[in-house]
């Protein structure tokens, strides 16, 4: 049988607060000073319509930490033997589980798993394995870890199709063979003949897909990696060409919606190899994680930063994670998508500085932290995965963005976003800041100016997280970086009059809202526009993660511009974010906040109000609902905590 592994198939406020905030505006961005205007709360506001899956996983911020078999299977081009799987789990439990890497996940090379349940669901990773999924889920649980599974619920194994006794779960009248079209094999045009693609138009198809997802959930699997989605949608690979029959956009969206529904709040859905057509709308609506670059492959600097730099309208849109994270950063953030930069193979890099850059990038972008080195490969490189201060950024939910220079998409203008300078705000108001040198030859100095780039006119206390050293109060984070080197800092601004400011330019954007800087007078590097009426099925919104010590009615300020004819109203919704299903309830609202009209779009004012926040982590969403009027640009929100 031809080995069609996933890797071989791929070729390669207060008045005082307001006065302070406006007083800090630089002369180059002078704005008309406007006195604070009270917000007018109306408790009858309907909820916002969402474009995203908005699961407990994405609302929590950054991706999970786990280990994957890829470091064994890619070099061997073979499924991992069960004894090697066990040895790596034991190594993981002894060395990394205490650092939060608590999932062991399979990967490709899956065609050799042909033993199925009576409903056609595979019972183990490979036929050569003695033990089934349940055994390994229990083995991991005994070590306070969990089982992650790589499999696509749209696959139907040939062995199940050819067994007339196999029927669809809950549909004994439908045989597994009835779910496929003869010859519609995954990778058919390049030799695939073991896995069929499911025909989602067939009776029983929905039950099969959702039964597959629930089958894994019942085994205690919290994380499902679903691969080769582009090949299902249109049957094409950007490097290979036609690989199998296309199944169409409508069927693709339908299949993803079934998976989303079945996964619910109990399973994290990782979408791998999607084309991300229509700006990733289908993936946003139905997934938690989405792959944004080519496979880790042999690892090393070339896979991290080299290879193709330009965009293509097919998976992978960008080849390396620096560009992929940057290009898709408008889709990241709480309640939106977790961008997945694929696996980390520290042992494949040429220097410790490159290894730190690998880790810094994944953490800054909010990616999952997926170790793919094995116990035999790791050598003396485990340290890069276990820096507690760096990992704390991930634990706090850091999802950074590159510095934006304009609203032009990165796919159209690679100069519109800076791949080497990243920042993201944490719920307590502190920041994670990362600087990179992607040059192969030049030592360069990289800087983020806190006032100009982040809107922090007061500066902040800077701590170097690899040096474990406080650098003191400063107006910037800066580092002289050798080729391939990087630095990552935690920046803690002082609280002024008890307030904490959250810039919209570093929040999560949805429903058509996005970055802009085409009007002067804003604080920081820009603002969010698009908070206006639209023709789509989702409302534009901005979401901020906010940490408070106790439940309280919290004075709030919203710096905005509004030159429409109407007094603009925009919903403010406060939600409690917690990775527990029962804790998804609304804390306050939705309520309306009034944004009175101003002279021009270059005039900025602050609307004042009060919202209730709960103790712990809250998600505060400002959105333009269907019953609202007018439009605003939003610069920041400020909370008196």
Curated annotation (Swiss-Prot):
GO terms for molecular function: carbohydrate binding; glucan 1,6-alpha-isomaltosidase activity. Residues 556-588 are annotated as: Disordered. GO terms for biological process: carbohydrate metabolic process. InterPro entries: Aldolase_TIM (IPR013785), CBM6 (IPR005084), Galactose-bd-like_sf (IPR008979), Glyco_hydro_27 (IPR002241), Glyco_hydro_27/36_CS (IPR000111), Glyco_hydro_b (IPR013780), Glycoside_hydrolase_SF (IPR017853), Melibiase_C (IPR041233). Keywords: Glycosidase, Hydrolase, Secreted, Signal. It is found in: Secreted. Residues 500-640 form the CBM6 domain. This is Isomalto-dextranase.
């Amino acid at each position: 049988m031809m080995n069609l592994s996933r890797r071989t198939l791929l070729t390669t406020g207060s008045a005082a607060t307001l006065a302070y905030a406006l007083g800090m505006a630089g002369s180059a961005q002078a704005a008309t000073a406007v006195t604070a205007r009270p917000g007018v709360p109306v408790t009858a506001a309907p909820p916002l319509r969402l474009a995203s899956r908005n699961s407990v996983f994405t609302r929590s911020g950054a991706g999970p930490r786990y280990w994957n078999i890829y470091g064994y299977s890619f070099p061997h081009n073979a499924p991992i033997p069960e004894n090697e799987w066990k040895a790596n789990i034991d190594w993981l439990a002894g060395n990394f589980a205490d650092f939060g890497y608590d999932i062991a996940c399979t990967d490709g090379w899956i065609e050799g798993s042909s033993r199925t349940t009576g409903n056609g669901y595979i019972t183990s990773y490979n036929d050569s394995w003695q033990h089934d999924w349940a055994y390994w889920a229990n083995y991991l649980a005994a070590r306070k870890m969990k089982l992650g599974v790589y499999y696509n619920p749209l696959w139907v194994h040939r062995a199940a199709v050819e067994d007339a006794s196999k029927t669809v779960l809950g549909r004994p009248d439908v045989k597994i063979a009835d779910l496929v079209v003869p010859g519609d094999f995954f990778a058919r045009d390049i030799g695939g003949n073991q896995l069929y693609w499911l025909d989602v138009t067939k009776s029983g198809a929905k039950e099969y897909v959702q039964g597959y997802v629930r089958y894994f959930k019942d085994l205690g699997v919290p994380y499902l990696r679903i691969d080769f989605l582009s090949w299902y949608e249109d049957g094409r690979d950007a490097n290979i060409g036609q690989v199998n029959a296309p199944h169409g956009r409508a069927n693709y969206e339908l299949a993803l919606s079934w998976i989303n529904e079945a996964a619910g709040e109990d399973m994290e859905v990782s979408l791998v190899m999607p084309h991300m057509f229509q700006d990733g709308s289908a993936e946003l609506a139905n997934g938690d994680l989405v792959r944004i670059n080519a496979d880790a492959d042999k690892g090393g600097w070339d896979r991290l930063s080299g290879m193709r730099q330009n965009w293509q309208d097919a998976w992978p849109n960008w080849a390396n994670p620096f560009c992929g994270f940057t290009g898709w950063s408008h889709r990241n953030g709480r309640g939106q998508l977790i961008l997945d930069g694929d696996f980390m193979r520290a042992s494949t890099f040429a220097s410790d500085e490159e290894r730190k850059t690998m880790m810094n990038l994944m953490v800054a972008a909010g990616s999952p932290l997926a170790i793919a080195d094995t116990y035999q490969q790791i050598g003396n490189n485990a340290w890069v995965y276990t820096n507690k201060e760096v990992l704390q950024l991930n634990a706090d939910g850091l999802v950074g963005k590159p510095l934006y220079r304009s609203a032009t998409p990165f796919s159209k203008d690679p100069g519109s976003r800076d791949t080497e300078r990243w920042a993201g705000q944490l719920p307590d108001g502190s920041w994670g800041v990362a600087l990179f040198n992607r040059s192969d030859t030049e030592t360069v100095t990289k800087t983020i100016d806190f006032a100009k780039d982040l809107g922090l006119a007061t500066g902040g206390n800077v701590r170097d997280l690899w040096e474990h050293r406080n650098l003191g109060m400063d107006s910037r984070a800066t580092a002289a970086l050798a080729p391939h080197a990087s630095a990552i800092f935690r920046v803690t601004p002082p609280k002024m009059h008890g307030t904490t400011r959250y810039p919209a330019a570093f929040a999560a954007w949805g429903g058509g809202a996005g970055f802009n800087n085409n009007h002067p007078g804003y604080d920081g590097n820009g603002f969010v526009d698009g908070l206006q009426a639209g023709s789509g099925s989702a409302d534009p919104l901005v979401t901020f993660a906010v940490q408070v010590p106790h439940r309280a009615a919290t004075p709030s300020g919203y710096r905005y511009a509004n030159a429409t004819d109407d007094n603009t109203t925009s919903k403010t919704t406060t939600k409690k974010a917690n990775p527990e299903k029962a804790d998804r309830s609304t804390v306050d609202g939705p309520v309306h906040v009034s944004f009175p009209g101003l002279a021009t779009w270059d005039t900025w004012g602050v609307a004042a109000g009060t919202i209730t926040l709960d103790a712990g982590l809250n998600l505060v969403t400002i959105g333009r609902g269907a019953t609202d009027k007018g439009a605003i640009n939003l610069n920041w929100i400020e909370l008196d905590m």
